[in-house]
Amino acid sequence: MKLPIYLDYAATCPVDERVAEKMMNYLTIDGVFGNPASRSHKFGWQAEEAVDIARNQIADLIGADSREIVFTSGATESDNLAIKGAAHFYQTKGKHIITCKTEHKAVLDTCRQLEREGFEVTYLSPKCDGLIDLDEFKAAIRPDTILASIMHVNNEIGVIQDIRAIGEICRAHKIIFHVDATQSVGKIAINLAELSVDLLSMSGHKLYGPKGVGALYVRRKPRIRLEAIIHGGGHERGMRSGTLPVHQIVGMGEAYRICKEEMATEMPRLKALRDRLYNGLKDIEETYVNGSMEHRVDSNLNISFNYVEGESLMMALRDIAVSSGSACTSASLEPSYVLRALGLNDELAHSSIRFTVGRYTTEEEIDYTIELVKSAVKKLRELSPLWDMFKEGVDMSKIEWSAH
């Protein structure tokens, strides 16, 4: 077993060896290096064919038509293109958008930008298990609502929103429905032929493909129109200009193909590893799972260890790569806004650790992690005066701290 152990697959995945090998054939003079927009010679045709194959592989995984796939630089750009593109195109119909407080920053910050442009945004609070109350969602709809953006699987707590039901509500009210599926594609079966989803964001690197490439699904029937946010050349049917990075697109396509083939065996394996980890940690005193355990992606476990500071626990676990909060926001020492939205107090939010398992995780690594976490929590609590007071039966909520 190699140290450190990687348990942060929700932040990024290593590129699968099969994917890397395939990508190498699309870079040098000996491979296919042409520009897919070069229509006048074989180098361009070969590159275009490679892009078409990848487009089909991505569409196959989500039950879409390959003409509905637009390549981008990643899920952040896909979120921006979907939300800004739809809001700007349909703004004559209304300027109201619905989203949720626990969305990824790529959605929340995009909505904040639209607010500066004169749009109104309703930010729904989730229930304490992280799920959206469908009645609250319905109640937020106004005559001028044009767009709703709700993620499929949350990147921090792994809860699965009911996008089928939300999609049906949106379709009935003629509202465009965008789903950030960065954390769910390849982990949960998605068939867009059966879902009322109009726009869906995806990433390459969260699925063992390369970083720097993603895609946006844009429904054709009923047709969804977007205003471009990147101009120049009219690539990707005018929605996203720029020379296509063939090697990255080929990598993303191959990664999605492998996921489609292996999902039926891989997800039960990951669930068993996640459950093994949970069963090993759940008996530690004062530990709480964040988010619904029932409606949750099989690879995620987010636990708060009360009376332990999350940052110091991560330091004590330096042989294990885990995170507190998401990779995009864990650099700030603020407690996770996702956990705060669930109603957790600052202390519990600060003591949370996210474990996410993946393709290269083994049982041996999980068992090692369980032992290490147990001893680290025990050690850190021995240093904590709060833990002593809690063990002595002091009601912590009644303590008044004086400012120095």
UniProtKB/Swiss-Prot annotation:
One of the GO biological process terms: [2Fe-2S] cluster assembly
Modified residues (N6-(pyridoxal phosphate)lysine): K206
Gene3D superfamilies found in the cross-reference section: Aspartate Aminotransferase, domain 1, Type I PLP-dependent aspartate aminotransferase-like (Major domain)
Active-site feature positions: C328 (cysteine persulfide intermediate)
Reaction catalysis annotation: (sulfur carrier)-H + L-cysteine = (sulfur carrier)-SH + L-alanine
Cofactor requirements of the protein: pyridoxal 5'-phosphate
Residue sites binding pyridoxal 5'-phosphate per the record: A75, T76, N155, Q183, S203, G204, H205, T243
Alphabetical list of PROSITE patterns matching this protein: AA_TRANSFER_CLASS_5
NCBIfam families found in the cross-reference section: IscS (TIGR02006), PRK02948.1 (NF002806), PRK14012.1 (NF010611)
Record family assignment: Belongs to the class-V pyridoxal-phosphate-dependent aminotransferase family. NifS/IscS subfamily.
The protein, known as: Cysteine desulfurase IscS
Organism of origin: Actinobacillus succinogenes (strain ATCC 55618 / DSM 22257 / CCUG 43843 / 130Z)
